[in-house]
């Protein structure tokens, strides 16, 4: 899959869209609140919070914004209580879609997600209808540069506990067990690497090839889901034609 990796298909457009809409701080803020609520406000003893803080800093989120979100999650500041809900369904072309929401209103989120699936040619299904097609994995993506030695990076990643390493056209992709994600990320950071993407995500086992006629319809639904205020992440297995720009 060189040059046409799962990360390229699944993550590149998502990251671009979030950045263009200026929504990423809001999404990371919710993750910080949830991580601090579930595991406490001390990143030394809360690996999930440590990971989200690293993600926030990589996105250039201001320190005071990070601190406020953590305090809200820990109950030190008044804030909204969020719960995580995952919806599953299909986009045009038989593309499997998982929609992760962090919401303070379950009914609002359910109605909004269902409306978007109905309006843009998808089908919202029952829990479990597509999740079996995905695996929860840690994913680290590093941009290829002349300064990075591929063999050295691979050895460092595998020795740190990574499950898999692949070299694509423009990036290196490192996959970990979710439990090992923090350790691998921190070890590579100590060795001077920076990441285009570093997160625990849902990686599809099989991609669904989408033709040029269907691709705009598929992407439209995915875009509209990502624009929803309650939606945190959209995972899918669409594999677009090389010439499709999105």
Curated annotation (Swiss-Prot):
Pfam families: TACO1_YebC_N, Transcrip_reg. It is found in: Cytoplasm. GO terms for cellular component: cytosol. The keyword Transcription regulation applies. The keyword Cytoplasm applies. GO terms for molecular function: DNA binding. Keywords: Cytoplasm, DNA-binding, Transcription, Transcription regulation. Belongs to the TACO1 family. NCBIfam families: PRK00110.1, PRK12378.1, YebC/PmpR family DNA-binding transcriptional regulator. This is Probable transcriptional regulatory protein NT01CX_1819. The lineage of its organism: Bacteria, Bacillati, Bacillota, Clostridia, Eubacteriales.
